[in-house]
């Protein structure tokens, strides 16, 4: 029998830090190094630093939000507090797509690497699964569903163990590859052979921002954290700083250990020569044992990240339902375990669905990256809005210098979305505008008891304008568009648009914060 219960505060700082690090270290680090090298050359090191800075700035903003009302599914509910239910609806839709498909991506990545040992898991000459391969994916999803079904502490213990195991290999890779380090590689063909455009493009197209996106699971479990006002900020900052250090060292180690003769044709072909960067470089250098460990870790790392998002996504669904713009059944929390089980069942079903039409890792990576950044990007405007309409809200973690950090972090988020390219931006942001229209068409079904529909629309117009202007800029720009606005003027244009939209969004928040029906879980 399922009774309505409450979330249980069982997660410690260690648990939360490992959730953050574990979510960040999935399949991204295993693919990105060679892609970044092909797009930016050695200057890809700067791409990793810029990506880390962007996520750190957003993480600091999330510290203020996550500590000052810690709520399950906070990524959805904070915009509802500041700008109304329509904002929660738009964020809920895009975040559910991103999180649920990310579970599938990681499980698919684990299966693709496992095919190096068990070829019958993948179709010959393809990353697509055989029937047996798909059933293996399904079994993994069932296993992670079971881990998350009974207790959040069961999930945390399993995640801590997986995280420790999967970090040993990247650290070992760094140490071993540095023993082959050749400094002259960093100047082969010039340090930045593709200029600043290459550095920018690598952040999105190279998989860097995908590799970093692991903060929202920390926010999603905020109601289950012991001493959240201290634990959430420390765990967020630790996760980003540690991951940035490891990623930069991995990239430098990869760049410096490539045999010099393989660079004679330039950097552009490196991703073809090293499609699985660290496995392939280990084989090239004659270290079969390291290649074996990399493949082993390549199975464990994505699986661990998939487990984390199997835990985080139900909290997002719960937050969306609590906002009043999704089915009420998903607000139910099991009384004994403290798990939002209806939301977990939906997550499980969606994660299976995403393995059907999009069977390979490469086909979803760009879309999921942009979708996740969109869910992150709203945080600075939400925090600015709550400072205006809820100035007395207790803020145990108060971000100083927010007048600079807020707009800068929003601008960087907008640029990352723009750098994803026209093919991704056009349909993803277009779909969000369509969802806005659907909300208006079903005006008799939407919640208006706390905030009128007129006010919800007024407080959300800035986001729709943001989507529309980024679509136009992407079409006219140099990242997959018609190049009517060349680089770097297109990037500068998007930055100016984002700055204007930030202040529009901050100043059109609700007159009073919308905490109607919100009580601590």
What is the meaning of each model-derived region?
Residues 8, 13, 131-138, 226-229, ...:
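Loop-to-transmembrane helix boundary motifs in multi-pass membrane proteins
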Residues 8, 31-136, 242, 249, ...:
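Extracellular loop-to-transmembrane helix junctions
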Residues 1-34, 38-43, 49, 56-63, ...:
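Membrane-interface "cap" regions at the ends of multi-pass membrane proteins
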Residues 1-10, 383-405, 426-521:
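Terminal cytosolic tails of multi-pass membrane transporters
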Residues 132-183, 195, 236-240, 368-377, ...:
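Membrane-interface loop-to-helix entry segments
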